[in-house]
């Protein structure tokens, strides 16, 4: 995917979301369940870049705005991450041993472990009930992700990977960190305004080294895997 294509995807997502908000003034139906299992862990790959001053301020402002709203799930700064490729649904309890075939996964990952990726020109992208911080990856990162995805699809982890992507493309087009999940159909007016006031802002770049880990849904719990993990 060329960078301009991804820029157009982000722009289109924002336009579609704003149009949908215009037709729905309220928050709509409240979700009874969380987006993801809050307790179980999944296998995923990604980066945990340093939190820049501008991104730290953005998250703090969002936290202040949502602190009294029980429907808002705002990402803590310590969970700031960009997923490279999510591998499984939340399948594992905290101390549950991973299956023996994890050895195959760590062997595949060895080629990618510790590689640095850079995501540039971070900007807010709005979905009807979420706010993302998304950017443009370097071409090498796109190629690496495609290669890793193909290797996993050719492994014993194919079914887990396909189940994780039942409702999304493989690999997913956006390179993003989810800053806010709202447990309703649409964001409330204050959060819509928060986005509209900042949608043109550039939050610079994010860079980090790739890791394979057992994580909770927002990476505030993260256990990197090594060759010794079974």
List the predicted regions and their residue ranges.
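Histidine-dependent nucleotide/RNA phosphoesterase domain, centered on the 2H-phosphoesterase fold
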Residues: 1-230
């Amino acid at each position: 995917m060329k960078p301009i294509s991804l820029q157009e995807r982000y722009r289109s997502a924002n336009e579609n979301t704003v149009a949908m908000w215009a037709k729905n003034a309220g928050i709509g139906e409240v979700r009874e369940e969380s987006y993801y299992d809050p307790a179980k862990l999944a296998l995923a790959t990604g980066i945990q870049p340093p939190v820049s001053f501008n991104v730290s301020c953005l998250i703090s402002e969002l936290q202040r705005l949502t602190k009294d709203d029980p429907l808002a799930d705002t990402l803590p700064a310590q969970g700031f991450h960009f997923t490279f490729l999510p591998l499984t649904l939340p399948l594992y309890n905290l101390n549950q041993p991973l299956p023996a075939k994890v050895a195959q996964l760590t062997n595949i990952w060895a080629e990618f472990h510790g590689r640095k990726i850079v995501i540039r020109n971070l900007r807010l992208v709005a979905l009807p009930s979420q706010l993302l911080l998304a950017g443009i990856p370097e071409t090498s990162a796109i190629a690496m992700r495609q290669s890793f995805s193909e290797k996993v699809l050719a492994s014993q982890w194919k079914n887990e990977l396909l189940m994780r992507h039942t409702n999304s493309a493989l690999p997913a087009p956006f390179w993003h960190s989810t800053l806010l999940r709202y447990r309703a159909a649409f964001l409330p007016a204050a959060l819509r305004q928060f986005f509209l006031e900042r949608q043109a802002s550039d939050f610079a770049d994010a860079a980090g080294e790739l890791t394979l880990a057992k994580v909770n849904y927002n990476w505030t719990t993260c256990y990197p895997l090594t060759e010794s993990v079974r």
